[in-house]
C-alpha cells in the first residue's frame, strides 16, 4: 500500500481535490475525467475488442468447420495458433516508442486497419500454411497495440484512477469478444453464400468490423496530455489540461517527456520489480489465453455440446468475468491495494480449474469454466495496475509496458501450446499447467509484497528515494 500523503486529494473520485490550483470545482473535475474516459478508454476498449477477436477467432472457426476443410492434422492447429506470438513478443518494445513518434491516431488506427485487412484475407486461404502466414502478419501488427495503449492510458491518470480504467479497457474487449460466439453462430448461417463456407465468413466479417473501427478511431482518439495542451485541439480548455497535468505531476511528477535516450529506455529491463510484475502477468495470461482459445473446443469435445451451443456458451462466463473484473478493480482503487486483489482472483481460478479437470458431469465443469474465466480475466487489469502504479518516468513507463506485455504474450504462447489435440477431450496437461500458473502467481505476489514493503520502510527512514521522486512509495 502506498503512502496516502503522496497522492492525497488527487483522484477525482476523492472528496478533496486541488481546486485551489486548477480553479475547477469537483463537479468540473469529474466532468473532465469522464470526457477523457469517453474518448480514450472507450475507444481503446473497442480496438482491444477487435484485437482479441482477431487473434482468438481460431477456436470459433475451428468449430465452424475450418479444421475439416483445411485438413488439419496433428498439431497443425496449435502451430497456426502459436505462430502469432513470436513476432508479437519480439516487436513489443517498438509500440510505446512509435506511438510517441507518430501519435495515437496515426499509429493505432493504422496498424488496426492493416491487421483488419489481413484478417479478411484469412477467409480466402487454401491451406494451413497460408493461414499461419497471415497469423504471423497479424501478430507483428498487433504487437504495437497493447503496450502502446497501456502506456497511453497511464499518461492520463493518477495511480489510483488506473485500475478501474484498465478494467473498463479490458472489460469492453473481454465481454464484447465473448459475444462473438453469438456472432459467429449467426455467421454460420451464411455457409455457402458467395461460394464461401461459414468459417471463411467469420474471418471476412470480423476483419471488416476491425477496419471500420480503425477508421472511426482515427477521428476519436486523443493525443498525450502534454501534446494536447500545446496543440490547437478544442477537446479540453487550457484550464482543464492544467488540471490533468497538475494532478499527475503531484501524483508522480512525470508529465514532462524527457528526450528519448535508447540507453535509458533499455536500462528499465534491469529493474527486478518489472520482471516480477511481468511474471505475474505471464501466469495470468497463460490461463486467460487457454480459455479464449480452447473453451469452445472443451464445450464440444469434452462436454458433448453441439456446435451452436458451444459457440453460444462462450459468452456467459465472460459476462460474469466482466462483473468480477469491475468489482475487484473498484475495490482495488478505493482501498489502494493491488496484491490482495490478484491473490483473490487467482484463488477463483484455482477453484475453477480442478472442477473443470477432475469432476464428472457438465454441471460442475460449467461452474469451473465460470470461475476460471472470472479469475484469470479479472487479473489482467489487476496485474496491469500493479505494474503501472509502481513505475515513474515516461520512457521507463514505456519500456516497462513493453516488457510487461511481452511476458503476457509469452503466457499466451504457452497457453496455445499446452492444450494439445492428442490430449482431447479432457486436455489434462493443459489444465494442470494452468493450475500451476495460478499458484505461481500467488507466490510471486507474496514475494513482491515483501520486497515492496521493505523498500517503503527504507523510504520512511530516509534511506531511499524511489524513481528520483522524494516521498514516492510503492503500492502493493
Enumerate the language-model features and the residues they cover.
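Extracellular/periplasmic helix-loop-helix junction of adjacent transmembrane segments
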Residues: 59-90
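Helix-breaking motifs and short loop linkers at transmembrane-helix boundaries and internal kinks
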Residues: 54, 70-71, 94, 102-103, ...
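Central mid-sequence intracellular linker of multi-pass
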Residues: 159-173, 192-270, 429, 434-471, ...
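Helix-to-loop junctions at the C-terminal end of transmembrane segments
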Residues: 90-103, 323-337
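Cytosolic juxtamembrane N-terminal segment immediately preceding the first transmembrane helix
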Residues: 1-58, 68
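Conserved MFS/SLC helix-loop-helix module at the cytosolic interface between two early adjacent transmembrane helices
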Residues: 90-129
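Extracytoplasmic gate region of multi-pass secondary transporters
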Residues: 59-60, 263-329, 384, 416
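Residue-level signature of mid-helix packing/kink "hotspots" within the transmembrane helices
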Residues: 56, 85-93, 143, 177-178, ...
Amino acid at each position: 500500500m502506498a503512502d496516502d500523503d503522496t497522492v492525497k486529494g488527487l483522484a477525482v473520485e476523492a472528496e478533496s481535490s486541488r481546486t485551489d490550483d486548477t480553479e475547477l470545482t469537483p463537479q468540473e473535475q469529474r466532468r473532465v475525467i469522464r470526457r477523457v474516459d469517453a474518448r480514450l478508454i472507450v475507444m481503446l476498449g473497442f480496438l482491444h475488442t477487435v484485437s482479441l477477436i482477431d487473434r482468438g477467432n481460431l477456436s470459433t472457426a475451428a468449430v465452424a468447420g475450418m479444421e475439416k476443410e483445411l485438413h488439419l492434422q496433428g498439431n497443425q492447429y496449435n502451430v497456426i495458433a502459436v505462430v502469432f506470438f513470436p513476432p508479437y513478443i519480439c516487436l513489443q518494445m517498438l509500440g510505446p516508442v512509435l506511438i510517441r513518434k507518430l501519435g495515437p491516431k496515426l499509429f493505432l488506427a493504422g496498424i488496426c486497419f492493416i491487421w483488419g485487412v489481413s484478417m479478411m484475407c484469412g477467409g480466402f486461404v487454401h491451406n494451413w500454411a497460408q493461414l499461419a502466414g497471415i497469423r504471423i502478419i497479424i501478430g507483428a501488427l498487433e504487437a504495437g497495440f497493447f503496450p502502446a495503449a497501456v502506456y497511453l492510458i497511464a499518461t492520463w491518470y493518477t495511480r489510483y484512477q488506473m485500475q478501474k480504467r484498465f478494467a473498463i479497457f479490458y472489460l469492453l474487449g473481454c465481454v464484447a469478444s465473448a459475444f462473438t460466439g453469438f456472432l459467429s453462430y449467426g455467421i454460420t448461417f451464411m455457409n455457402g453464400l458467395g461460394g464461401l463456407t461459414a468459417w471463411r465468413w467469420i474471418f471476412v466479417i470480423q476483419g471488416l468490423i476491425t477496419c471500420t473501427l480503425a477508421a472511426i478511431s482515427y477521428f476519436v482518439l486523443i493525443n498525450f496530455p502534454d501534446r494536447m495542451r500545446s496543440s490547437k485541439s478544442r477537446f479540453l480548455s487550457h484550464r482543464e489540461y492544467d488540471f490533468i497535468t497538475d494532478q499527475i505531476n503531484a501524483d508522480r511528477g512525470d508529465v514532462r517527456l524527457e528526450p528519448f535516450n535508447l540507453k535509458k529506455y533499455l536500462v528499465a529491463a534491469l529493474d527486478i520489480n518489472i520482471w516480477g510484475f511481468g511474471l505475474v502477468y505471464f501466469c495470468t495470461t497463460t490461463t486467460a489465453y487457454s480459455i479464449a482459445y480452447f473453451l469452445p473446443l472443451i464445450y464440444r469435445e469434452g462436454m458433448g455440446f453441439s456446435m451452436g451451443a458451444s459457440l453460444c456458451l462462450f459468452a456467459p462466463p465472460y459476462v460474469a468475468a466482466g462483473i468480477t473484473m469491475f468489482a475487484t478493480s473498484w475495490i482495488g482503487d478505493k482501498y489502494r491495494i493491488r496484491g490482495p486483489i490478484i491473490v483473490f482472483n487467482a484463488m477463483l481460478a484455482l477453484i475453477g480449474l480442478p472442477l473443470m479437470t477432475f469432476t464428472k458431469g457438465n454441471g460442475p465443469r460449467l461452474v469451473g469454466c465460470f470461475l476460471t474465466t472470472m479469475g484469470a480475466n479479472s487479473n489482467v487489469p489487476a496485474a496491469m495496475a500493479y505494474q503501472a502504479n509502481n513505475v515513474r518516468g515516461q520512457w521507463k513507463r514505456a519500456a516497462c509496458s513493453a516488457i510487461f506485455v511481452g511476458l503476457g504474450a509469452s503466457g499466451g504462447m504457452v497457453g496455445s501450446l499446452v492444450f494439445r489435440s492428442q490430449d482431447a477431450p479432457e486436455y489434462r496437461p493443459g489444465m494442470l499447467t494452468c493450475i500451476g500458473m495460478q499458484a505461481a502467481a500467488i507466490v510471486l505476489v507474496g514475494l513482491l509484497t515483501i520486497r515492496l514493503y521493505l523498500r517503503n520502510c527504507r523510504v520512511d527512514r530516509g534511506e531511499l528515494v524511489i524513481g528520483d521522486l522524494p516521498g514516492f512509495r510503492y503500492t502493493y
